[in-house]
Amino acid sequence: MKIMRKSHPLFKIVNHAFIDLPTPPNISGWWNFGSLLGMCLILQISTGLFLAMHYTSDTLTAFSSVAHICRDVNYGWLIRYMHANGASLFFICLYMHIGRGIYYGSYLYKETWNIGILLLFLSMATAFVGYVLPWGQMSFWRPTVITNLLSAIPYIGQDLVEWIWGGFSVDKATLSRFFAFHFILPFIITALATVHLLFLHETGSNNPLGIPSDCAKIPFHPYYSTKDFLGALLLIMFFMTLVLYFPDKLGDPDNYMPANPLNTPPHIKPEWYFLFAYAILRSIPNKLGGVVALVLSILVLAFLPYLHTSNQRSLMFRPLSQSLFWTLVADLLLLTWIGGQPVESPFIIIGQVASILYFTIILILMPLAGLIENKMMKW
């Protein structure tokens, strides 16, 4: 008699995806972040659902409804802080996942990589509209400033901004539609993540050496399911420490004041996980140029498969490309810091240099390093 997980139509899908999945025998802990992202997504959807039960998307009551959740709802404060800090955790895992993909050449699986870029854009959109919902000072001023950048688009810019706002300013219509977007987008992300997995399982996982491992693959369970469980346990420990001891560490104090259109905060900035893109946006004095640079800061990832010049897939044995990769990581950290600073000297020039370096490394230096390494290896 056949085992049910191998014969039942529904269990068979789960079996092929998570139990008997042929997996390279040498993948490291850097491959854990995919499953951790799945865990973060489940956490965000479940906590968000409970918050949506008590939240009201009206400009008059939104701020007080969040206060009501924290004060009067049983464990509401915990659900709220888990959801708020869960977004930070999600983006930490996301950036680690992308970094691993770049380092080990996983971007050569073009379909999987492009779906991943689309998932990144959708995740950023979800986080952006979600930050508006508490209707604090930063919740109001941030979308006002960021969405107003779309007015730089020729011909349709101003109409597009007013269409997004639902009026001539960020108001009740904006809050209602942003709440609707914030509710539906995670489910679209879940569907796309399934497609992402589907494409990945068509090709099989990459490995640190970047070489085919079809002849030596092992089943995912119990080897990697145990490893993923350990990763999840460590992440939960870090996450709960953050939520219970430092819940407001990654937030903005201005958001504890109700939204006031007549009082502008001294320094409007996005959440920490968008600061690198915000710094690139600010580094260009022209409004339209800044918007284009902002989009390209993420879209540039789509060029990576076409800029790969090395005969080796992974950076494991490519010291020149390795040094460029870690320079890129340092540059992104510098941009994140700059994005949180006021627009004044010397931060302006540092941001401009770091922005130029970001695009130069990805578009010019890394392909060049691949060619040099090929020459050094006499390939």
UniProtKB/Swiss-Prot annotation:
Cited PROSITE patterns: CYTB_CTER, CYTB_NTER
Protein name as annotated: Cytochrome b
Note, other: Heme 1 (or BL or b562) is low-potential and absorbs at about 562 nm, and heme 2 (or BH or b566) is high-potential and absorbs at about 566 nm.
Pfam families, sorted: Cytochrom_B_C, Cytochrome_B
GO CC terms of this entry: mitochondrial inner membrane; respiratory chain complex III
Species of provenance: Thomomys bulbivorus (Camas pocket gopher)
Domain of life: Eukaryota
Protein's membrane topology: Multi-pass membrane protein
Subunit (UniProt): The cytochrome bc1 complex contains 11 subunits: 3 respiratory subunits (MT-CYB, CYC1 and UQCRFS1), 2 core proteins (UQCRC1 and UQCRC2) and 6 low-molecular weight proteins (UQCRH/QCR6, UQCRB/QCR7, UQCRQ/QCR8, UQCR10/QCR9, UQCR11/QCR10 and a cleavage product of UQCRFS1). This cytochrome bc1 complex then forms a dimer.
Cellular location(s): Mitochondrion inner membrane
CDD domains tied to this protein: cytochrome_b_C, Cytochrome_b_N
Gene: MT-CYB
Binding site for a ubiquinone: H201
Family statement: Belongs to the cytochrome b family.
